[in-house]
Amino acid sequence: MLSAQELLAHAESLTDSVQLVDRILRAGLLLHASDVHLDPAADSVRVRFRIDGALEEVLRIPAAMQNAVTSRLKVLASLDIAERRAPQDGGFSWRMGGAGAFAASPLDVRMATLPVRHGERVTLRLLETGGKRLGIAELGMSDSDRAAFEAVLRRPHGLVLLTGPTGSGKTTTLYAAIQELMKGEPLNIITVEDPIEYEIPGVAQAEVDSADKVNFAKALKSLLRHDPDVVMIGEIRDSDSLDAAVKAALTGHLVLSTLHTNDAKSSVTRLVDMGLDPNLVPATLRLAVAQRLVRRLCPECRTKGVRGWEPKGCVACGGRGYWGRIGLFEMYAPETGLSTSIADDARAKVDAGITSEAEILRALGG
């Protein structure tokens, strides 16, 4: 089987859009890219992969191939190939052919187009549906944070929130929590997601309607009639979804969800701003977990510098100096007063040579 580098070598000379798209998707899968960006310019289309959170240019396609490549992707995603002046969204499933370990690797691809000056910009989100889901032990939590997180999952009711910006790994942590819950006694677990990112065998997963016929609040009210033990809501977006989540948490259900705040303690302020009675916070919010993602230093080539461990680059990591990502976490529990610091977690990971000072500055700022 060809490597990602071999697939992309001389790909710009291909005149068959089917082959070119296939090579881009194959290379993206082999490099574990989370996103593919196709950015049109006057004379070419820049192809970039987001690998471990960082964008890398991997290919330049001649401008003459732009429409053919975009049309091929639109056909796969069942989009209107004639519509080039309005944004479109769609998706498709794709499997890598050939022999070897990746022969049957399924890939769910979400596609979005945006008309720009020199054509249509295309972004592909790659979801490896057959890939192994991370467990709590693999997220990167410290022993104390992990113990607090697992303890709250054993509680029969209450609200558990994952907070952080987009792309900070909140959904991955939610799925890890669901997997942990499924290890114990049989539970009726129902999720409401927008969209469903990964199928979880044994879990009833509902998807929010993009036309807003079924929003988070409506879906949550409905699923409570199905006798759930655990409810996972993709995101608490407004006062209606918050009200439904709080009622579920106060009536004997364990509710897991996400919120956009910068740190764990700010989740309380955000909930109150959205309409939660401050007196209900300790009785409702069991735990808020704030997180960020940073790149792991490649263990094969990391070097000890003046400011600690630093990236170098080798064959094993493709010259990047990093391989994979790990979470930075902090916890806050209003009921018990538990409060840990993401800055302390970051410092511990730098000192241990897991990540670099530069990555911490990128993720947390100065």
PLM ranges: what are they?
Residues 4-366:
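Short, flexible helix-loop junctions that flank or precede catalytic/ligand sites
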